[in-house]
C-alpha cells in the first residue's frame, strides 16, 4: 500500500508541476503535459487529430492499434523526440532500455525541468528502471491465474494455491431413442399353447 501511495503522490506532483506555465525556455520548466493519440500508420507525420482517432478506436469502427504520444507541450524551436507507446504491445513492448521509464512517460526529465525530473528520475532509477541509469527491473507482481488464491495476501508472497482448471459443463437433455424395430406381439396369447 505504501508503494501505491508513494507512486500516486509522485504522479500527482508531476502533473501539478507540469500544469504550471512555461517560463519562456525552449525546453520548458513546467508546461502542460501533451498527450495525444494517433494512428500507427501515420507515425512519420504530425497529426493533430488525436481525439478523432481515439473516438474512432473507442467506437469500435476501427480496430487497428493506437499509439499514445506523451511529452511536454510543443514550443517554438524545440526538437523533442517523442517515443510512441503502442497500446497492444504488452508490458515488454520493444525490450530496449528506454521502455517502461515512468519519469519519461509522465513527462519527467527535460519537459518537467532538470531539478524535479532529474532528482526523482535518478532516485527512482535503481528501483523501477527510471530515467537516469539503473538497469531495467521487472515488476515483482505477476498476473494471477483464474483460480489462484494467495496464502498471505498483502505480504508479496508467491506461495499460492492454484485450483484445477474447470471447464464449462453443459448438460444435454436425455431423450428416449426411437425403437429399432417394431416387434410383433400376438393377441390373445396366440402361439403360446404347447400343443400347437
From Swiss-Prot:
Signal sequence extent: 1-16
Record-level GO BP terms: chorion-containing eggshell formation
Subcellular locations according to the entry: Secreted
Transmembrane segments: none
Domain of life (superkingdom): Eukaryota
Main location: secreted
Keywords, alphabetical: Secreted, Signal
One Gene Ontology cellular component: extracellular region
Listed Pfam families: Chorion_2
The protein's role, per its UniProt record: Chorion membrane (egg shell) protein; plays a role in protecting the egg from the environment.
Family of this protein: Belongs to the chorion protein S19 family.
Name of the protein in its database record: Chorion protein S19
Originating organism: Drosophila grimshawi (Hawaiian fruit fly)
